[in-house]
């Protein structure tokens, strides 16, 4: 009876495809509906899923706005290029205290022998360029997350990591806690 919150297509996928369908039929998990831009409250915490463009062959892809008693965050671990989204990321960042955003790849060429244009994620260098007009205070809200094993930001001593931090952005590490 573990609650699993899912958008409509993901719920259908879990119900109709093994081995996940067994979890549903045996009631190991109980699907709870999520809807685009519909807020769910959990005590002092509220969560609002919103659709973002990304691979959708099986399910929707969503980001989340999370509101706590004192602070707020956006969480966007997966998205296509920012230009594919109808929302202005810089303006959205101004409305929250923390912005945890997709940093799958640092830059083009990170996957040798693979056409990176076919792997839809914003590069960290693109995200920084998009957000360079923000004040340092606003850039300090940004936490790069969801890094591929090839991403040089995983090495805290890399020149790329130092460059990101020198521009006022943050690189999330395992175990980080951001108080809401």
Where are these regions (language model features)?
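Core dinuclear metal-dependent hydrolase active-site scaffold
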Residues: 31-92, 176-180
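Cap/insert and terminal regions of metallo-dependent hydrolase folds
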Residues: 70-72, 80-176
């Amino acid at each position: 009876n573990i609650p699993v919150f899912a958008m409509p297509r993901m719920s259908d996928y879990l119900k109709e495809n093994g081995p996940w369908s067994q979890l549903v039929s045996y009631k190991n998990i109980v699907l709870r509906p999520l809807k685009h831009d519909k807020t769910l409250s959990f005590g002092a915490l509220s969560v609002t899923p919103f659709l973002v463009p990304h691979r959708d062959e099986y399910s929707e892809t969503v980001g989340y706005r999370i509101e706590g008693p004192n602070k707020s965050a956006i969480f966007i671990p997966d998205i296509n290029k920012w230009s594919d989204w109808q929302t202005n990321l810089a303006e959205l960042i101004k409305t929250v205290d923390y912005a945890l955003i997709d940093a799958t790849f640092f830059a083009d060429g990170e996957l040798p022998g693979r056409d990176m244009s076919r792997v839809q994620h914003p590069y960290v260098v693109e995200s920084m360029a998009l957000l360079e007009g923000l004040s340092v205070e606003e850039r300090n809200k940004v936490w790069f997350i969801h890094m591929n094993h090839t991403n040089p930001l995983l090495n805290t001593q890399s020149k790329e990591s130092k460059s990101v931090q020198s521009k006022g952005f943050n690189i999330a590490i395992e175990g980080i806690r951001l108080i809401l």
